[in-house]
């Protein structure tokens, strides 16, 4: 039996795909004990703050518990393989496509508290990754309206800023999770993003909406904490699993997203 921890946006899609593929699984909160008949664990529980990561600057206890203490407690409580859904928002800058071997450069000295917690958790979990996975996703988006969906955020924000970034389509992510459970490729860190990258303006143009644009300087003044903007290298993932290219994923998902509103 598979244990799925988490009841958030990403966990919903993983549960839906597991059901579609007839996995025997149970869905639990992050305080529940691992059942004795469990064979594999997917940890999609965490704390991202509402409406966005700025909330983590004040809710630091919740951020530490959900993103650092919880995955460590889980790893120390069982010998089962675990697939952690984490974040690729641990880098800043475009000097390269960041690989799984690169040390995070967006942490407590220059990052949001959320990103810093994710970077620290990755470091602390590293000794466990000989028998576990850590999926680093970025800017998740999907075909349904949801306050955590990147498309819904872009639709609702009064002003936007243009950056190039890696992105993760949540249905593709869910299929990838199921593939890893079934095939068990090499353990470790994986950048689970749709290959390539895209920009805010490209996505907004695909959605066919008009927005007012901020400069990078204005955006920096408007947010409570700095944001990660970067492109992750996906070659390691591509060697074991194929996800749609970023541009294709945006185009097809936006089409479905719009159709759900008609």
What are these regions (language model features)?
Residues 1-21:
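N-terminal Rossmann NAD(P)H-binding glycine-rich loop of SDR-like oxidoreductase domains
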Residues 32-66:
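NAD(P)H-binding glycine-rich loop region in Rossmannoid oxidoreductase-like domains
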Residues 55-83:
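NAD(P)-cofactor binding segment of oxidoreductase domains
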Residues 72-109:
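Conserved Rossmann-fold NAD(P)-dependent oxidoreductase catalytic core, especially the SDR/UDP-sugar
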Residues 113-117:
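Active-site helix of classical SDR
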Residues 123-172:
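NAD(P)-dependent short-chain dehydrogenase/reductase
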Residues 176-179, 183-224, 228-229, 262:
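Mid/C-terminal beta-alpha module of Rossmann-like enzyme folds, strongest
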Residues 210-213, 225-262:
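C-terminal amphipathic/interface module of NAD(P)-dependent oxidoreductases
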């Amino acid at each position: 039996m598979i244990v799925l921890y988490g009841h958030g946006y990403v966990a919903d899609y993983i549960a839906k795909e597991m059901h579609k593929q007839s996995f025997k699984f149970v869905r639990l909160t992050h305080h529940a004990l691992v059942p004795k008949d469990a064979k594999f664990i997917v940890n999609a529980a965490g704390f991202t703050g509402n409406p966005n990561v700025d909330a983590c600057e004040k809710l630091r206890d919740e951020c530490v518990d959900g993103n650092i203490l919880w995955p460590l407690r889980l790893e120390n409580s069982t010998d089962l393989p675990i697939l952690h859904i984490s974040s690729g928002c641990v880098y800043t800058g475009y000097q390269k496509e960041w690989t799984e071997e690169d040390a995070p450069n967006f942490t407590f000295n220059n990052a949001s508290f959320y990103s810093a917690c994710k970077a620290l958790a990755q470091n602390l979990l590293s000794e466990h990754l000989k028998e576990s996975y850590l999926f680093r996703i970025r800017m998740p988006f999907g075909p349904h309206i949801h306050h955590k969906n990147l498309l819904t955020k872009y639709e609702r924000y009064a002003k936007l800023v243009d950056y190039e970034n890696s992105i993760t389509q949540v249905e593709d992510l869910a299929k990838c999770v199921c593939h890893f459970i079934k095939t068990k490729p090499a353990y470790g860190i994986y950048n689970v993003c749709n290959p390539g990258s895209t920009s805010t303006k490209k996505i907004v143009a695909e959605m066919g909406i008009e927005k007012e644009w901020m400069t990078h300087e204005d955006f920096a003044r408007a947010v409570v904490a700095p944001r990660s903007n970067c492109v992750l290298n996906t070659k390691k993932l591509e060697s074991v699993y194929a996800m749609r290219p970023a541009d294709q994923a945006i185009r097809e998902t936006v089409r479905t997203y719009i159709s759900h509103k008609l």
